[in-house]
């Protein structure tokens, strides 16, 4: 416990909240260029080949972002838009690539949750 004199000299430091997505720099989305597109394996007990991309952002950061949905058209030098949101079973992946914007195509033949995957209304 500090004395009253110590508290007068230096007041208590309020703890600052640490951001979960520092590369966005308080923006909802950021644009970037893919430097590498590859697959990664998740932590135990899950097993899969998750599609991820290494992205160099306009904010100067280089981050790993997850590519959601079935199938994608991304390759090196593709321009993408990323948002926050981690993937629980992939360590170090704290961002998602937004489908249906810039060079990223939406998911084909998607009927449910279309807005999350950049899919247009299906033709009847």
From Swiss-Prot:
GO biological process, one term: translation
Protein name: Small ribosomal subunit protein uS12
Signal peptide start and end residues: none
Family: Belongs to the universal ribosomal protein uS12 family.
Organism from which the protein derives: Synechococcus sp. (strain WH7803)
Location of the region described as Disordered in the Swiss-Prot/TrEMBL record: 1-28, 104-124
Gene3D superfamilies: Nucleic acid-binding proteins
Annotated disulfide bonds: none
Assembly, per entry: Part of the 30S ribosomal subunit. Contacts proteins S8 and S17. May interact with IF1 in the 30S initiation complex.
Keywords attached to this entry: Methylation, Ribonucleoprotein, Ribosomal protein, RNA-binding, rRNA-binding, tRNA-binding
Residue numbers carrying 3-methylthioaspartic acid: 89
Any one Gene Ontology cellular component term annotated for this protein: small ribosomal subunit
GO molecular function, one term: tRNA binding
Job description of the protein: With S4 and S5 plays an important role in translational accuracy. Interacts with and stabilizes bases of the 16S rRNA that are involved in tRNA selection in the A site and with the mRNA backbone. Located at the interface of the 30S and 50S subunits, it traverses the body of the 30S subunit contacting proteins on the other side and probably holding the rRNA structure together. The combined cluster of proteins S8, S12 and S17 appears to hold together the shoulder and platform of the 30S subunit.
Annotated Pfam families: Ribosom_S12_S23 (PF00164)
InterPro entries: NA-bd_OB-fold (IPR012340), Ribosomal_uS12 (IPR006032), Ribosomal_uS12_bac (IPR005679)
